[in-house]
Amino acid sequence: MEPLDDARLVAAVRSGNSAMAGAFYDRTRGMVARTVQRLLGASDSDFDDLVQVAMIELLRSLDRYRGECSLDTWTATISANIVYKHIRRRGLERHIFAREIAPEDVPQTAHQRPVLRGMVERVLHHLAQMAHERAWTFLLHDVHGYSLDEVAAITGATVAAAQSRLVRGRREVHERIANDPDLAGGLDAREDS
């Protein structure tokens, strides 16, 4: 049997075809898991629960999918929104930035590891002090690579509001880092090694 294209698959699930619900799950589950992993990390204790919540939300909101973007983009946006809401409820977590530093990028000398760890903690401290919306817009766009349209959808803002938050958030992050003697000293120490 030839696989259904996304439009026909969505139409079949919308019409109540329960046999196609399994095909929809198979089609979208990978993108959901990748999105949750990218934003939260696979080792997070809530990973499996959030994947399941995102799958449920996909089915609940299927009537709102208009086909204006690919099914993968829509799936990733819904999934990211679930993660965003979850993290907002539990607060800004330390591991968001810690995960961004790949183990192979981490200095291996005994002197460099604590310096880098301290720098990450300082950056997280500054993000936690910022307005929540600005910090998350900065993280989603500049760290995780979401487009402004996607950031707006994830955070429930207009594209103009997301753009404004991004500009102000970037400016604030840069100012905070530039004015932080611990970060400036840490950068100097890392560059000297």
Each PLM stretch: what is its role?
Residues 24, 28, 32, 36, ...:
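Residue-level preference for hydrophobic side chains embedded in well-ordered alpha helices
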Residues 25, 127-148:
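Short amphipathic alpha helix immediately N-terminal
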Residues 15-23, 33-53, 159:
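Short, charged helix-capping/linker segments at alpha-helix termini
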Residues 86-107, 114, 182-187:
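Short, basic/polar amphipathic helix motif occurring as a linker/hinge flanking DNA-binding modules
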Residues 14-15, 38-42, 52-71, 89-91:
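Sigma70-family region 2
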Residues 36, 88, 130, 135, ...:
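Short, Lys/Arg-enriched C-terminal cap helix and immediately downstream tail that follows
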Residues 1-30, 34, 191-193:
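N-terminal module of bacterial RNA polymerase sigma factors
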Residues 80, 84, 123, 134, ...:
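DNA-recognition helix of helix-turn-helix
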